[in-house]
């Protein structure tokens, strides 16, 4: 670092090679993710009012996604200016902190949902006390405090770096610093791999419980399996490429901190993988609100009520609108959960926690 000029004589990375793809993807995420997450937040709020603990996790997930989306306009500007941050050091720290923390907050809440659904399907009676709204609120508070604290180190360091071409990088330094490399290893193993492994174990238990249920129809088993795999796929597709490159960059730096060759080769791929993490903000509400007939019906009703409200300007009509978000993975803790077109009945049993699931179709209209 040249202290007189504030210029960092680091690796030569060409910021012009990827100035179109990340901002284009971010604009797409803003356009799709903002309205869908607002709708998902309202749906989750309705779940919480019905004393459904899953709604607490969904609400926190939507809040995290919305906070992340609010930072994207500045990152669009950053990439369109060829990785040149023009909004000052304070905004760089704040928006970078929110941007990167959201990755691990989202993963943590997806993991919470996985554990909650495993307990609901595999052990509905034994762990009923853990599946309460108060417990979900406490767990959510711990998640926020833990993830924000674990990712707060950059707030106490200078995160603006000017290269030889007078570009001001925000939250990007090539090569990285040693403390950043060790923090990245923590993020990869504790923030990403551990929760994802836990999700795999939970959904393995879910699939085993569903498979052993003789009263669950084959079609419903397929739906539950598809939803289970979709949740795991969100984490894998959205976050795995980024963490693979993050791990590679950190490992190479710790082994050869003077070598810029690897940083220069993976620069474009690293930026693209980082942009792909934003697709999580689109996948979350789509997965939980649009993947099955019941949820699609509820969303259609919600949009219909919203249009009626805007057209008639009668707030009471909107207040009386009802939304119930019940799916095979979001059914309430009670012994009977309703979806559009089906009723999920869980009859009592004396066989411990092996509670069979049965779908009772309503009479034809």
Curated annotation (Swiss-Prot):
One Gene Ontology CC term in the entry: plasma membrane
GO molecular function terms listed in the Swiss-Prot or TrEMBL record: G protein-coupled receptor activity
Main location: membrane
Domain of life (superkingdom): Eukaryota
Keywords linked to the UniProt accession: Cell membrane, Disulfide bond, G-protein coupled receptor, Glycoprotein, Membrane, Receptor, Transducer, Transmembrane, Transmembrane helix
Record-annotated disulphide pairs: 11-260, 92-170
Cellular compartments annotated: Cell membrane
Transmembrane residue ranges: 11-47, 52-82, 88-123, 132-158, 175-212, 217-252, 263-291
Regulation acting on activity, per entry: Activated by a network of residues that connects an extracellular-facing cavity to Glu-147, a conserved charged residue buried in the transmembrane core of the receptor. Protonation likely drives conformational changes in extracellular loop 2 (ECL2), which stabilizes movement of transmembrane 3 (TM3) and a series of rearrangements that connect the extracellular-facing cavity to Glu-147, a residue only conserved in proton-sensing G-protein coupled receptors.
Extracellular loop 2 (ECL2): annotated span: 159-174
CDD domains: 7tmA_GPR4
Carbohydrate attachment residues: 3, 166
Cytoplasmic side: 48-51, 124-131, 213-216, 292-365
Residues in the signal sequence: none
Segments on the Extracellular side according to the record's topology features: 1-10, 83-87, 159-174, 253-262
Job description of the protein: Proton-sensing G-protein coupled receptor activated by extracellular pH, which is required to monitor pH changes and generate adaptive reactions. Activated by an optimal pH of 6.8-7.2. Ligand binding causes a conformation change that triggers signaling via guanine nucleotide-binding proteins (G proteins) and modulates the activity of downstream effectors, such as adenylate cyclase. GPR4 is mainly coupled to G(s) G proteins and mediates activation of adenylate cyclase activity. May also couple with G(q) and G(12)/G(13) G proteins.
Family affiliation: Belongs to the G-protein coupled receptor 1 family.
Protein name, per record: G-protein coupled receptor 4
Organism: Rattus norvegicus (Rat)
Lineage of origin: Eukaryota, Metazoa, Chordata, Craniata, Vertebrata
């Amino acid at each position: 670092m040249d202290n007189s000029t504030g210029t960092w004589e680091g690796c030569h990375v060409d910021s012009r090679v990827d100035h179109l793809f990340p901002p284009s993807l971010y604009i797409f995420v803003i356009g799709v993710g903002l309205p869908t997450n607002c709708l998902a937040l309202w749906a989750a709020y309705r779940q919480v009012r019905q004393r459904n603990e899953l709604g607490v996790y969904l609400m926190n997930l939507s809040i995290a996604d919305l906070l992340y989306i609010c930072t994207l306009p500045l990152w669009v500007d950053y990439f369109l200016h060829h990785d040149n941050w023009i909004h000052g050091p304070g905004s760089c720290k704040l928006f970078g902190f929110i941007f990167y923390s959201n990755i691990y907050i989202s993963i943590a809440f997806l993991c919470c949902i996985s554990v909650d659904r495993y307990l609901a399907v595999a052990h509905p009676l034994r762990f009923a006390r853990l599946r309460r709204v108060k417990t979900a609120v406490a767990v959510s508070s711990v998640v926020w405090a833990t993830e924000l604290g674990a990712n707060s180190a950059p707030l106490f360091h200078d995160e603006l770096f000017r290269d030889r071409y007078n570009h001001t990088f925000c939250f990007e330094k090539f090569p990285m610093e040693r403390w950043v490399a060790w923090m990245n290893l923590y993020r990869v193993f504790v923030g990403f791999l551990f929760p994802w492994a836990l999700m795999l174990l939970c959904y393995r238990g879910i699939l085993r419980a569903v498979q052993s249920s003789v009263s669950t129809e084959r079609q419903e088993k397929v739906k539950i399996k598809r939803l289970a795999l979709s949740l795991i796929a969100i984490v894998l597709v959205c976050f795995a490429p980024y963490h693979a490159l993050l791990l590679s960059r950190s490992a190479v730096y710790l082994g050869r901190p003077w070598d810029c060759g690897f940083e220069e080769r993976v620069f474009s791929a690293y930026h693209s993988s980082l942009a792909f993490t934003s697709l999580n903000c689109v996948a979350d509400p789509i997965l939980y609100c649009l993947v099955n007939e019941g949820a699609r019906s509820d969303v259609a009703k919600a949009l219909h009520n919203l249009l009626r409200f805007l057209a008639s300007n009668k707030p009471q009509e909107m207040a009386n609108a009802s939304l119930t978000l019940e799916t095979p993975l979001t059914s309430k803790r009670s012994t009977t959960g309703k979806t559009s077109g089906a009723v999920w009945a869980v009859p009592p049993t004396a066989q411990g926690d092996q509670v069979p699931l049965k779908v009772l179709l309503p009479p034809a209209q």
